[in-house]
Swiss-Prot record:
This is Putative protein KleG. It comes from the Bacteria. It comes from Escherichia coli. Residues 1-23, 61-87 are annotated as: Disordered. The gene is kleG. Keywords: Plasmid. Residues 68-78 have a biased composition (Basic residues).
Amino acid sequence: MRHSSLTPRGKSWPCSAPPWPSSRTGWACLPRRCASRRRWRAGRPCSTTRTGPRFARARWIPTTGDRRGRRPQRHRPSTRREQIFSR
């Protein structure tokens, strides 16, 4: 075992940091620099941007997924429906 230091025998997850549930892979490891942050004590990962159930459906739509409260992905004239949606 090359990475025996990364996986202590008592742990069931593959990393030294505690895992948190993520919808993409099922479980993800908390990054090392975030392990002692105040956000992690609240029971959520470091980057909480766009991970909740509100963005679960919009993530797979490439045009409207990034629309709310962010800049558009590529520079192109937006249609009338998108201007109404982005307000």
